[in-house]
């Protein structure tokens, strides 16, 4: 067996398929782009869906990648098994309508067994196939695989519901009898069974059917190959590691954790080993996720990161790590993965800052969680039960980040069990909620074969020409059918040449009209999208008959187009200004460029202050007024990166890219349209800045005429305010408003002082009226005060002087009622609690309330019920 590092193995796989004509596709971000069906990129094929469903035709139908992925559905198994991980890399080779089973199987065998490549012993390899897939079995035999090493398994069929599906073939490596954890006669002791001896290293999916909405399986117009090889598993084979964790992908993290721990060492005992593994695994996932722009929060993928951080911290405590430690593992992860993911190491300082902040935050939450757990244990014991409720264990897990096994361990120390079945019910409900939140969108579309088959060329000339463009009508589609002519109604059209921009990168499509050779308008263009073979597909409203192969004049709506391109150029200036003010960690997370406004989403940890927003706005306007030239060139990706161009949504770029520069200030990969000079924008104004999710902020802004109109409207509003506050000049308005606020505050203080004196005067009369109820003294009165604050002041006075054992006060303010109950410490010890009393009388005023044993309050909407409530207080005390 060769001795290879994880970096060498990864590169060897990519090099092999590059030799077979595959394009090496860079790993996409873990945060999905334009895919609401996924929380995370969870496989290599997840980034290839647009090719497999036919919505985009790739430049090269053969592709290969090493794709970072995250899965958290089995998070509780991480650290307890040899191969469960949250972050993993999936090596894959893909064919979109090119080669199929024969080549995929032949190349897999060559990579695995050739001395030039992996060089594994053929006798240690086993293959499973779908029983009805006789072709796969035949091709495996043709490569030299022994018939008894080919096993038919009914589950070998890949199907995710509607969309591409097909049989698959799994490849297993026999690690030998030393790894066997089952008896010889165990039904799972075979390649494909649940055992440790036969390790699945590769899965080849033969995507050859469309699973239709009706439940039938129809042959795909273009058959595909989708494979997945877990890098971590393959590395464990090469490095003869008992588990994935004893490889160079994890051991440096484990060794660093050993250094930081309280004298703990990996391998000393199984319980500590689980914690070492969990920390190493989660450190990788946390580091990569934050590097890709996800941030800790209480929702979505941010919640996943927060859970992983908290889980790692809790396992750190088991190893004696009482201080923050997780941030110190970030650079270790960066160094391990630097050869293929240099950005992770580059972003280490930023990631460390986020992790350290989250660790500090959790230390506070942890204490709250432990207090809750101790209270739950005490309550369970007091009620005579021996099992902690599953819903309580789930609350600890969901709110405080306590893993189930940790709750079970703490409960076990107190001789209590935990209702695991009840916990699983709550977990399933949570998973169902998450799944339903993403189920409205299709995970992978059905191939639209009509568009895939249309390969007539279509040249986009909109960067240079916008009107009077002569284009031949090559294709007309009506109701998913190619036709030769159309008289009226909606149709889709492809022209030999077009000035109309197709919606892409957040920029909306152009609008406009189509003229015939007589100059008469025959159609309106309402939308333009990219067809799979990169033509511009025009959605048109046909007004007069149009026919295939005729030549038409295409005119873009210039007013619409010019407003859009101003806003697009503004997004580039805004993107760079945000990096300048907030830091290089900010990344574009989405954009929308409309004619009347622009929307820009970006990643950032924390809120953006008013001062920071003002700086951003000023920078953008300074660059507009500097009259910077805007230019674009076409080049290859490598040259573009060397120029310093910012890549947004990297996976969307081909070999040849367009690089847009605004002076020497901004440079980005971009296919959109722009102004010729920044001065054309005139003015830039931020309308709003908000948070829209976990670590994602959104800015909406306007330019040019819309910016002027916004400022004019704000000026008019300011003039109205100036008139209302009688400011002599517009510039005096803030000072005048400040003076009015100061006067108002002084009046409010005077009123509060008067109310306080009045309350004290009332107190004398109120506290004189004391009733005795079965040995408990009670003051229950309706008084006239301005609100709950005054009631609490009276309660403070009552407590100081201890006028009675129990105090009940009520007041009516308009149509609302405020109630307050106070109980002395002695009576609380005797079992009389303010919270119990308030709950008994609050319904009389149509409300509810609660509080501490010594003080409680309530509100209601039935003033007429206040005397009844005060009487009910007497009755309640009499029953105690």
Swiss-Prot record:
Catalytic activity: tRNA(Ala) + L-alanine + ATP = L-alanyl-tRNA(Ala) + AMP + diphosphate
InterPro entries, sorted: aa-tRNA-synth_II/BPL/LPL, Ala-tRNA-lgiase_IIc, Ala-tRNA-ligase_IIc_anticod-bd, Ala-tRNA-synth_IIc_core, Ala-tRNA-synth_IIc_N, Ala-tRNA_ligase, Ala_tRNA_ligase_euk/bac, DHHA1_dom
Main location: cytoplasm
EC number of the protein: 6.1.1.7
Biological process according to GO: alanyl-tRNA aminoacylation
PROSITE patterns xrefs: AA_TRNA_LIGASE_II_ALA
Localization, UniProt: Cytoplasm
CDD domains with a match to the protein in the record: AlaRS_core
GO molecular function, one term: aminoacyl-tRNA deacylase activity
Domain of life from the UniProt record: Bacteria
Annotated family: Belongs to the class-II aminoacyl-tRNA synthetase family.
Record's protein name: Alanine--tRNA ligase
Species per Swiss-Prot/TrEMBL record: Lactiplantibacillus plantarum (strain ATCC BAA-793 / NCIMB 8826 / WCFS1) (Lactobacillus plantarum)
């Amino acid at each position: 067996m060769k001795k290879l590092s994880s970096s060498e193995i990864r590169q060897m796989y990519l090099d092999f398929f590059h030799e077979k004509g595959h394009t090496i596709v860079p790993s996409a971000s873990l945060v999905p782009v334009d895919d609401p069906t996924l929380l995370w990129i969870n496989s290599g094929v997840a980034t290839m869906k647009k090719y497999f469903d036919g919505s985009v035709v790739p430049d090269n139908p053969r592709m290969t990648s090493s794709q970072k992925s995250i899965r958290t559905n089995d998070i509780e198994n991480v650290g307890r098994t040899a191969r469960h991980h949250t972050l993993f890399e999936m090596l894959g080779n893909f064919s979109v309508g090119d080669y199929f089973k024969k080549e995929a199987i032949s190349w897999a065998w060559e990579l695995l067994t050739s001395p030039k490549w992996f060089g594994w012993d053929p006798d240690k390899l086993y293959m499973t196939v779908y029983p009805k897939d006789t072709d796969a079995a035949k091709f495996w035999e043709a490569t030299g695989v022994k018939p008894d090493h080919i096993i038919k398994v009914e589950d070998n069929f890949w199907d995710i519901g509607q969309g591409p599906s097909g049989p698959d073939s799994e490849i297993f490596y026999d690690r030998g009898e030393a790894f066997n954890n089952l008896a010889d006669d165990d039904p799972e002791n075979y390649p494909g069974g649940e055992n440790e001896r036969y390790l699945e290293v590769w899965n080849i999916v033969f995507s050859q059917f469309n699973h239709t909405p009706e439940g039938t399986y129809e042959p795909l117009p273009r058959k595909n190959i989708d494979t997945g090889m877990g890098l971590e598993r393959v590395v464990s084979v090469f490095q003869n590691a008992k588990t994935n964790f004893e490889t160079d992908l994890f051991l440096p993290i484990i060794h660093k954790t050993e250094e930081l721990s309280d004298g703990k060492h990996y391998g000393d005992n199984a319980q500590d080993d689980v914690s070492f593994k969990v920390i190493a695994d989660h450190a990788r996932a946390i580091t990569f996720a934050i590097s890709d722009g996800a941030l800790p929060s209480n929702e979505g993928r941010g919640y996943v990161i927060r859970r992983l951080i908290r889980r790692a911290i809790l396992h750190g405590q088991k190893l004696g790590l009482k201080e923050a430690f997780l941030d110190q593992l970030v650079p270790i992860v960066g160094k391990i993965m630097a050869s293929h993911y240099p950005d992770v190491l580059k972003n280490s300082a930023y990631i460390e800052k986020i992790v350290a902040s989250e660790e500090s935050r959790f230390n506070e939450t942890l204490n709250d969680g432990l207090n809750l757990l101790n209270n739950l244990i005490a309550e369970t014991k007091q009620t005579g039960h021996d099992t902690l409720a599953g819903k309580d264990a789930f609350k600890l897990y969901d709110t405080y980040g306590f893993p189930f096994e940790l709750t079970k361990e703490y409960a076990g120390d107190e001789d209590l069990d935990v209702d695991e079945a009840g916990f699983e019910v709550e977990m399933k409900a949570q998973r169902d909620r998450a799944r339903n939140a993403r189920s409205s969108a299709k995970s992978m579309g059905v191939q639209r074969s009509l568009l895939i088959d249309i390969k007539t060329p279509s040249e986009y000339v909109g960067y240079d020409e916008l009107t009077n463009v002569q284009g031949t009508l090559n294709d007309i589609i009506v109701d998913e059918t190619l036709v030769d002519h159309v008289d009226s109604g909606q149709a889709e059209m492809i022209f030999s040449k077009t000035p109309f921009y197709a919606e892409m990168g957040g920029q909306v499509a152009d609008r406009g009209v189509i003229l015939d050779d007589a100059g008469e308008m025959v159609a309106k263009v309402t939308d333009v999208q990219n067809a799979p073979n990169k033509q511009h597909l025009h959605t048109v409203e046909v007004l007069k008959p149009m026919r295939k192969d005729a030549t038409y004049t295409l005119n873009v709506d210039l007013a619409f187009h010019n407003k859009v391109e101003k806003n697009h150029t503004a997004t580039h200036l805004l993107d760079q200004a945000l990096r300048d003010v907030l830091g290089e960690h900010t990344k574009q997370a989405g954009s929308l460029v409309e004619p009347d406004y622009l929307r820009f989403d970006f990643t950032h940890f924390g809120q953006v202050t008013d001062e920071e927003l003002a700086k951003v706005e000023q920078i953008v306007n300074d660059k507009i007024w500097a009259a910077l030239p805007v230019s674009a060139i076409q080049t290859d990706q490598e040259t573009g990166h060397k120029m310093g161009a910012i890549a947004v949504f990297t996976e969307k770029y081909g070999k040849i890219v367009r690089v847009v520069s605004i002076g020497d200030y901004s440079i980005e990969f971009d296919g959109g349209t722009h102004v010729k000079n920044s001065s054309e924008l005139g003015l830039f104004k931020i309308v709003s800045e908000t948070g829209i999710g976990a670590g994602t902020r959104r800015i909406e802004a306007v330019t040019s005429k819309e910016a002027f109109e916004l400022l004019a409207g704000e000026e008019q509003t300011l003039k109205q305010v100036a008139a209302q506050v009688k400011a002599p000049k517009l510039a005096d308005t803030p000072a005048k408003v400040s003076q009015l606020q100061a006067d108002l505050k002084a009046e409010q203080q005077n009123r509060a002082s008067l109310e306080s004196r009045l309350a004290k005067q009332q107190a004398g009369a109120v506290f004189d009226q004391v009733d005795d109820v079965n040995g408990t003294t009670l003051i229950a009165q309706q008084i006239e005060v301005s609100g709950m604050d005054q009631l609490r002041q009276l309660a403070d006075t009552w407590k100081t002087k201890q006028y009675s054992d129990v105090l009940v006060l009520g007041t009516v303010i308009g149509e609302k009622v405020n109630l307050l109950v106070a109980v002395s410490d002695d009576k609380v010890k005797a079992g009389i609690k303010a919270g119990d009393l308030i709950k008994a009388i609050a319904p009389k005023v149509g409300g509810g309330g609660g509080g501490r044993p010594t003080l409680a309050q309530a509100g209601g909407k039935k003033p007429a019920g206040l005397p009844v409530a005060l009487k009910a207080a007497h009755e309640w005390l009499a029953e105690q």
